[in-house]
Regions:
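Glycine-rich, basic loop-to-helix element that forms the pyrophosphate-binding segment
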Residues: 63-83
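A conserved acidic beta->alpha catalytic loop
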Residues: 38-47
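A short, conserved alpha-helix in the catalytic core of glycosyltransferases
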Residues: 164-166, 170-175, 180-207
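Short, acidic, metal-binding catalytic loop of nucleotide-sugar glycosyltransferases
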Residues: 21-31
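Non-catalytic, C-terminal membrane-associated alpha-helical segments of glycosyltransferases
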Residues: 217-272
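A recurrent flexible, glycine/aromatic-enriched loop bordering the glycosyltransferase active site
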Residues: 145-166, 233-234
């Protein structure tokens, strides 16, 4: 199987290298090409990726620090659509901080084939073996929950894109991640777009790698910070800036929920 893997990186040289090598070496039945959006790394990541091109099939795109996660993914996916029309069986969206297990991608491909070209969301566990990221199911409105491994036959609504296998024809139909997003929400939005286009999304049958949960410490949800600090962090590009949050909610849930949704975070901050 020919797989095009896309990810964004910034100043995680060793993790980036390990991610690429683990994916390739752990899935020998797959033929991988990588498109990597390096968002202005200063730790030698970009130069390392250039050197790795002598061994692996890697295209490196160079940013200047303003892409962030979703922006970098959008750039990489748009590049792939232009450079590689109809050239692959699958698109693989990954995060470079995932420690992948052996044959994890091959197993996801087998599951996708058995489930008739399903989008397979790779479930992540933390160091304690507990679910950390993966497929998502909405409960009511925009409130959601993480899906369990045992629910792999249950259709998902969207995903955290730590590792997502998308049939290439679905990628070509839906297109790239929405360029409006800079850091967060881009992956959730993309999953919802795939679902709207008629594609089935499912959780992987087993954990495909280790990726620990991001800590809330120092973020806008950290109640130990002052209200002003939380407000500033919320409107930061890596927080939940109001314009992007409103855009996401309106696009996917309608104007009514969007208006309610943009007010809720401020109430949380005020109430502490």
């Amino acid at each position: 199987m020919k797989v095009l893997a896309i990810f964004t990186c910034f100043n995680r040289k060793e993790k980036t290298k390990k991610c690429i090598e683990t994916i390739i070496n752990g899935n020998p039945e797959c033929n991988f090409t990588f498109v990597v959006s390096d968002d202005g790394s200063t730790d030698g990541t970009y130069e390392m990726l250039q050197n790795m091109q002598a061994v692996y099939s890697i295209r490196v795109l160079r940013g200047e620090g303003g892409w962030f996660y979703s922006g970098g993914m959008s750039v990489g996916m748009n590049y792939a659509l232009k450079q590689f029309p109809h050239g692959f069986d699958y698109l693989l969206m990954v995060n470079d901080d995932v420690e992948f297990f052996e044959k994890s991608i091959q197993n996801m491909i087998e599951q996708s084939i058995l489930q008739k070209d399903t989008v397979v969301v790779g479930a992540m566990c933390n160091n304690g073996g507990e679910l950390s990221y993966g497929a998502v199911k909405y409960i009511t409105g925009y409130k959601y929950r993480k899906m369990k491994l045992s629910e792999w036959k249950t259709p998902a609504d969207t995903f955290n894109a730590n590792c997502v296998l998308v049939p290439y024809k679905a990628f070509e139909k839906v297109g790239a991640m929405d360029s409006y997003y800079r850091h967060s929400l881009g992956d959730f939005d993309y999953g919802l777009s795939l679902k709207r286009a008629g594609y089935l999304l499912c959780q992987s049958k087993e954990f495909v790698g280790i990726c620990n949960n991001n800590s809330s410490k120092g973020t806008w949800t950290d109640t130990n910070l002052s209200r002003i600090e939380r407000l500033n962090k919320k409107e930061n590009v890596k927080g939940a800036p109001i314009k992007q949050w409103f855009y996401f909610l309106k696009k996917n849930f309608g104007l009514g929920l969007a208006i309610r949704g943009i007010i809720t975070p401020y109430i949380r901050i005020i109430l502490g």
